[in-house]
C-alpha cells in the first residue's frame, strides 16, 4: 500500500501490521486528524473469557485510545442470542440470559486491563447492544430497517456464500445476525457519534452493511477497518494450543501458562508478534525478530514478558519467567506451575497416572495420555514414564510431583492437607 497517513492511529496500524482493509483510508485518516473520534469493536458473549485470538483487536482499541480517540467495547448481550454465522460450518448453541450475563462479566475483567474507562475526554465506554435490541418492535424494525437490505447482496457475502456452497443449513435466525450488527453501528453513530467499526477480516460483510445502513438512514459518513485473521507461521489458528484455547482470564488459565504460550512462539513469528502484541518500538521488534539460532530466545522471553505484563502485571510476568528458569534450566519444580490439588477422599487408594495426566490438563483424554506415554512424551519428575498402568497413592504424593507432556508443558500434582 502506498498511502501515507496523516493520523497517528492509521500510521501505527500500518507500520505494525494491523491492517487488512479499510472502506476509505483517506476519509478515515482525515476524520482522525480533525479531532477526537469514536470507534468500536463488538464482542458476542459466547464464553466466560476472551482468548488470545481476541487480543489483536483489543490492542487496536488500546492504540486508538493512546492516540487520543475514544474506544467503545460493545458487548453483544442482544446479538449473542442469535449467533454470528460468519464462516462457521454449523449453528452456534443458543445461550440463556443468565449465561450471557455471566460471560459478559468475565469478559469485562480483561478490557479493564487494556483500556482506561475513566471520564477523560477519550475515556473508553462499555456498552451492551441489548439496550436497543431487546425492545425492538419486529414489524416496525422490518419496515424501517429491513427495507434497506438486499437479500441478493447478503447472499453474496463470502461469510454466507461459503456455508451455502457447502450445502450446510443457515437458519433464518442466523441470517438476521448481519442486520442486527448493522443496526448496532447505526445506533452507535446516532447515540454516541461513533464513526468507525473495527474487527477481523471475517467481519467485512457485516461492517459494510452497517456503513450502508447508516448512510441510508442518517446520511452520515462512517468507516470500517479490518485486521488480518492471524495464523502462526506453521499454519495454526492464533489463540489455540495443544491444550486448547489460551484464555485471558487468570482463573481459566494461569499467568504462567499464558507466559509459556508466548515463550513457545515459533522463531519466524517473534518479530511479527512483538509488533502486534507489545508496545515496544518497531525498530526493537525488528531487531529481536531478526536474531538467529539460540539468540532468538531473547526475543521470545521479551515477548512473553511484555504481553504478560500488559494482561497480568509486571509481578506476574517476573514470577512466570522465574518459574520457567527453575523448571527448564535447573530441573526444579517451580512454585508457579499449574497445580492439581487432590483431596484424600478424591485420591482414595490411588489414581492411575493416565487419570492424573488428564486431570492436570496435560492431555484431553485417557487415549491421548496413553499415547503420550507410549511415545515417550510423558515424564514423572523429569524421568520418562513407561507404564500407563502406574498407580499414584498417598505415599507417592508425600511431596508434590511434577508431570510433563513434551518439553514445554508441565503441571504439579499435590495432596491437600
Swiss-Prot record:
GO BP terms in the entry: tyrosyl-tRNA aminoacylation
Entry GO terms, CC: cytosol
Q: Which Pfam families match?
A: tRNA-synt_1b
Q: What class of enzyme is it?
A: ligase
- State its location(s): Cytoplasm
Where does the motif 'KMSKS' region lie? 237-241
Locus of motif 'HIGH' region: 45-54
Predominant cellular place of this UniProt entry's protein = cytoplasm
| Catalytic activity from the UniProt record | tRNA(Tyr) + L-tyrosine + ATP = L-tyrosyl-tRNA(Tyr) + AMP + diphosphate + H(+)
- For this UniProt record, give its keywords in alphabetical order, as a comma-separated list: Aminoacyl-tRNA synthetase, ATP-binding, Cytoplasm, Ligase, Nucleotide-binding, Protein biosynthesis, RNA-binding
The EC number(s) attached to this protein equal: 6.1.1.1
This entry's Gene Ontology molecular function terms read: ATP binding; RNA binding; tyrosine-tRNA ligase activity
Subunit composition and interactions: Homodimer.
- Enumerate the PANTHER family for this protein: TYROSINE--TRNA LIGASE, MITOCHONDRIAL, TYROSYL-TRNA SYNTHETASE
The Swiss-Prot or TrEMBL record describes its family as follows:
Belongs to the class-I aminoacyl-tRNA synthetase family. TyrS type 1 subfamily.
Report the protein's function: Catalyzes the attachment of tyrosine to tRNA(Tyr) in a two-step reaction: tyrosine is first activated by ATP to form Tyr-AMP and then transferred to the acceptor end of tRNA(Tyr).
Query: Could you tell me what this protein is called?
Result: Tyrosine--tRNA ligase
Q: Organism, per UniProt?
A: Ruegeria sp. (strain TM1040) (Silicibacter sp.)
| Taxonomic path | Bacteria, Pseudomonadati, Pseudomonadota, Alphaproteobacteria, Rhodobacterales
Which gene codes for it?
A: tyrS
